[in-house]
Amino acid sequence: VPFGHASPPTFLNSRGHKTYHFERNMMDRLAPVDRLVIEQRKEWGEILTGFETKNKYEVSDQEGNSLYYAAEVGGSLLLRLFLKALRPFTVMVVDSDSQTIIEIRRRFRFYFHEADILDADGQLLGKITKRFTLVRRVYSITDSSGEEIFQLFGPLLKPWTFQIMQDEMEQGRITKKWSGLAKEAFSDADNFGVTFPLDWEPSTKAIFLGAVFLIDFVHFENKGG
């Protein structure tokens, strides 16, 4: 069970697809993947009371097979209630044995939101930083040395889409996905899809997996989708 005890080698996730028990470098499981689905798992207590509890997510591949799990960890109830989407956070992405894959850390800021994406050893993989613009939503993606390697652009007329750009060429997208009529009626659960080139390094794909969580907090949390 994620965030607890170890799992058997394979089991079925909530959609009846296989979840794999991985060995080797867990980030390597991103190598054969060109699309990720990140689904927020709302707790019934939150649905019934309207209070934010700690966010939990399931990360699956393009075939619906579970790869990882993610959860917001730490943080006080007061921060959640008063700062809401502005609060600092740490999100841990783990495998089915609770082994860390990446960690996303966001410090408190009113503006120019940013988050660090760290590997399992705590080494910086990259950083996502919101840039100042009057209209468009723009983020800079930098590598561990601070060099900008990508940008994220949110088109004005497509509020649920962020284009992954490199040298003015679109390389992929982060898209908020509609989570279904029944779920939307009772919660503001956010689901995302991420697409990128198949031949990217797993560490680069992991940076954009981490970027999803900052985008979710800044643009969609407490906004009802």
Summary of predicted features, one role per range:
Residues 2-90, 96-99, 106-114, 120-125, ...:
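Low-complexity or membrane-interfacial segments used for flexible interactions
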